[in-house]
């Protein structure tokens, strides 16, 4: 995902480019805004920009191994956690990861409501459950041994 693919949010894109280029990325960022403003797209572009080995003109190159992995949601340092409707046998968002990746590939700028429609959530309330919180902590503790 390139920053140029995101409509608007120019100040946010400039800020993200600046903190990545100057190696001053804070330990956490909260990206928020009204529905339909491209928050997830901005986060995806930032992650790809951080990992890109050949940034060009404020954009990820799109062709290095890291960029190719990001474009298919298979980069080792990228993981998703999202609200879902708990069903029998599905305890973590990882249980929905195939559907999530397909959703993002087919609908790169769609909103949360569209994801709920994909899940066929009905009147069920999607949540991030305790098991999911434990899974986030486990994933964040991964270490590469290279």
Regions flagged by a language model, labelled:
Residues 2-146:
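Clamp-loader machinery-focused feature within the broader ASCE/P-loop NTPase space
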